[in-house]
Every structure is written in C-alpha cells, then in structure tokens.
Regions:
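Conserved cytochrome P450 K-helix/beta-meander segment immediately N-terminal to the heme-binding cysteine loop
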Residues: 281-306
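Cytochrome P450 catalytic domain signature, combining two hallmark sequence patches
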Residues: 1-16, 293-294, 307
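Cytochrome P450 heme-binding "Cys pocket" and the immediately downstream C-terminal segment
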Residues: 210-212, 325-362
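Conserved cytochrome P450 K-helix E-x-x-R motif and the immediately C-terminal K′/meander segment
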Residues: 140, 144, 228-269, 290
Length: 377
C-alpha cells in the first residue's frame, strides 16, 4: 500500500518554503539521503549539547519575569522555541546575531504554509509573495554563515548546521548551499513550528491538572536544583514529566492530520480510491478512539498504552516517523525541567476558553493563552 501513496506529492506546499531540490522536491535517492543527514543532525551526540543550550535559553527567557505576572504563553513559546531551535541548529554564533528581521522572515515562511497552500502554493496571494521574498533573504543570511564556517573549517561547532555541511550524497557529492539552507529551514519547522503549540498546551494542562502537576514538580525538585546543569542524562530520569507530555501529545497532537497523494488506484475494503486523490488520517481523531483510549477526553498521564500498533501516533509511525521526535521530546523536557522548579502557574481565563484551534494542520491553542505565574518560595 505504501508504494501506491506519495508523501512528496501530498506535501508540495513545502517546496516554496524549503526551496527547490529539498526534501519533497528532491529525487527519491536524494530525498532519502537528505532525510538521513537530518536524522544524523539530531542524534545523541548533538543532543547532549542541545539540552544545555535549551536550559540556557530558558534562563535568559525568565530573567526579567520577576516574582509574579501574566503572559500570553502562546506568543511566549513561539519566541522561545524559535530561539532554542535557532541556537541548536544554526549555533551560538548565529543566535547571538539573531535580529528581529530573522524572526519576521521566518514567520513569513510559516504563514506560507496555510491551508490554501495545499490547494495551490503558487497562486497570486500577498502571503505567498511575502513567503518567496523571505526565502530568498533567509538563503542569503544562512548562506553567509556557511561561507564564514567554510573559511574557518578547523572549528568544531557541534550543531546541526555542521552536520548538514559535512553531509554527502551516495556519489560522494556535497549538498549545495541552498540544499543546506533548505534542510536548516525544514528542521527548524520540525523543532519550532510544532513544538511551540505542544509547549503551550503542556503548560496549560499543568495549570489545569493540579494533582498531576504537583507530582511533576516534586519529581523535578528532587532531581534538579535551580543552579544545577540540566543534561541529556538527567532528562531520562523524569518519567512523570515524560508521561505528562505524552498525554498532552495524545490530546493535542502537533499535527491534526497526515496526508498522502494516491499515485496508483487502490481498492480499500471494496472502495476504489483513484490515483490523484489525496487521502488523510486524523491523528486528532485517532487519539480519541474509545477502542484504544477509554474516556478519551479525560487527561490521564498514567493511562495504559494501547497494545495496537499505531494507535498512538503523535509523530507518525513506521518508516516515515518524524525524524525530529526525539529532539522534540528532549526539548519539551528540557524547557519544563528548567521552568517548573522556579515557577507555578494558573489559568487567567475560564477553563473552557482554552481550546484547540483546528483550522490549520499544525495544532495550537486558540489565542491568546494567558497564564499567571508565581515564583516558588
């Protein structure tokens, strides 16, 4: 069945965002090689550096909070996860020089992936014109970093950009500058675009679920001191936080659905699905299937995992599982391991106002998402 379905054809809306010849616009052999390089950039050795980087970003983020206050955390996590993704993927040198221009360019690319782009990503629309201009400028900015690094090739950076620059295809040729830039953007989308929504929902559910959040906070207080360094190894020792995040991912998965384009007629249980059609599965709906998740709207981090393969698919599954799933979980745990020992949180608005926004493929809460924070004694 997988041979009759195409990911690349279904996700052509990403081509003007990532650039020509990148991922879903690359020939199958090159796409496979690019995805392998992307996986290599998110392997254990690099993630050891990333956990410390994320902890440092959280330190900087909360430095001006004071003892108490209110914030729209949908907006706050958009900014924080852009900083963490940029720092991890492009390195400290770029993060230190990161300007408001970069943020605006990146968000222009994000807006280029709205639902209409999956109908025709090249129609005459102001949002698509802004997307195209943003890609050209981002290619120039990231290209400048690549040129600097090539001029000082003796320095080791330990970030994703270094891995992308060292990556090769099966014939030994290296990625072009625009292919490297496209991989950076694609990986940033994986590390930021979806993670900001997950982080917002995690903090919102922590404010909602007081009994569970108390258990999570106790676990973190026991393992970490505020001044202690958060490491990849220590992040493996917080099962209650991990279970909490996994339940957030069940109720509020990063993507509402996954799509494929049918490239050869399929007879599915007696129903003909013709070539050229787009098919989709709803992760949001699958995670509410009562056959696998009794009382599905109840938030329960300790609910038994279903025995059925692919009943729980926040990052997809099988050979096409999201390459950044381990990075995403590490990032969530690092953020909250650094944040929760410092502050406790509560909802500002009535509980029912915190809802999923199902109008886009990437799931986030309907904004604003206001929470009140108080510094722990």
């Amino acid at each position: 069945l997988d041979l009759k379905l195409s990911r690349a054809a279904a996700y052509q809306a990403t081509v003007p965002v990532f650039g020509k010849g990148v991922i879903f616009d690359a020939p199958p052999d090159k796409m496979k090689a690019q995805l392998k390089i992307q996986v290599d950039a998110l392997r254990y050795q690099n993630m050891k550096n990333y956990s410390t980087v994320i902890s440092q970003e959280v330190d900087d983020w909360v430095a001006g909070w004071g003892d108490e206050g209110e914030l729209d955390f949908l907006d706050e996590f958009l900014r924080l996860t852009l900083h963490t993704a940029t720092h991890c993927l492009l390195g400290k040198d770029f993060r230190d020089r990161m300007t408001e221009e970069f943020r605006e360019l990146y968000h222009a690319l994000e807006k280029g992936l709205q639902a209409i782009a999956f109908v025709d990503p090249y129609m005459q629309q102001p949002v698509f014109e802004a997307r195209d201009k943003a890609l050209i400028r981002l290619q120039a900015l990231i290209g400048g970093i690549i040129a600097e690094r090539r001029a000082s090739s003796h320095i080791e950076y330990g970030d994703a950009l270094e891995t992308f620059m060292a990556g090769t295809y099966t014939d030994g040729s290296r990625l072009t500058e625009n292919e490297i830039t496209g991989l950076v953007i694609a990986t940033m989308f994986a590390g930021h675009h979806t993670s900001s929504g997950t982080a917002t929902w995690t903090l919102t559910e922590l404010a909602r679920q007081k009994a569970y959040s108390a258990e999570v906070s106790e676990e973190l207080q026991a393992l970490f001191k505020i001044d202690s360094q958060i490491t990849l190894e220590s992040l493996r020792e917080i099962p209650k936080l991990e279970a909490f995040i996994e339940e957030v991912l069940r109720l509020h998965p990063p993507l509402v659905l996954l799509m494929r384009r049918v490239i050869e007629d399929i007879d599915y249980n007696g129903t003909l699905i013709e070539a050229g059609k787009t098919v989709a599965i709803s992760i949001y709906g699958s995670h509410r299937n009562t056959d696998y998740f009794p009382d599905p709207e109840k938030f329960d981090p300790y609910r038994p995992k279903p025995d059925t393969l692919f009943a729980y698919i926040p990052f997809g599954g099988g050979p096409h599982k999201c390459a950044g799933n381990a990075f995403a979980m590490m990032q969530m745990k690092a953020i909250f391991a650094a944040l929760l020992p410092r502050y406790e949180f509560e909802l500002v608005d009535p509980d029912v106002t915190y809802q999923d926004d199902l109008s886009a493929i990437v799931l986030k809460p309907t904004g604003p998402c206001r929470l009140r924070y108080t510094k722990r004694k």
